[in-house]
């Protein structure tokens, strides 16, 4: 559902789109050795892809990589920062096929930073994102796999709450808004 320039994804819609992404990767014939899910947004996508791969006959190693530059809705802090990146990138070897998974590819800044680190290992990287915003891309990169071009619309993922007003929370899910309001009253 789209309201005021924000697209509110349901959990089912997001999960089904992630499975479509997994099917697109498998249909390409390119099989990764390792799946790196970019924490936070890519984590649920990574879980869905890994499960889909596993039940379809692919056993792919997987690990999350915490990275980010966003400080809020539409607010980009600048430099991409990795937490424990040396550990994750240190696992990669020349010739490894690495599938990097994220929820959305917009500016391409995160993808570019990840690609630079993976390229330095000699591994081959491909990028899979559920959603793509080509109009926001500031790099020469694009995802190798994606499900939907979402234009410039801001996506509110099923798990996202921070930055939403009480009205937006009610729009997203009235039961959720009530739970949050009750907990806020108890805590404050």
Where in the sequence are the language-model features?
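PRPP-associated nucleotide enzymes
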Residues: 1-188
């Amino acid at each position: 559902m789209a309201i005021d320039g924000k697209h509110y994804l349901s959990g089912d819609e997001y999960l089904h789109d992630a499975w479509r992404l997994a099917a697109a990767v498998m249909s390409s014939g390119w099989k990764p050795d390792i799946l790196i899910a970019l924490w936070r947004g890519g984590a649920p996508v990574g879980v869905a892809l890994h499960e889909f791969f596993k039940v379809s006959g692919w056993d792919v190693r997987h690990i999350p990589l915490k990275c980010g530059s966003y400080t809020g809705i539409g607010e980009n802090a600048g430099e991409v920062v990795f937490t424990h990146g040396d550990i994750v990138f240190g696992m990669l070897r020349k010739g490894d096929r690495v599938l990097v998974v994220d929820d959305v590819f917009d500016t391409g800044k995160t993808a570019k930073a990840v690609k630079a680190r993976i390229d330095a290992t000699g591994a081959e990287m491909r990028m899979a994102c559920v959603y793509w915003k080509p109009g926001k891309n500031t790099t020469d990169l694009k995802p190798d796999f994606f499900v939907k071009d979402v234009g410039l619309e801001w996506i509110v993922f099923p798990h996202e709450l921070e930055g939403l007003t009480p009205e937006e929370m009610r729009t997203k899910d009235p039961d959720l808004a009530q739970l949050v309001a009750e907990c806020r009253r108890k805590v404050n």
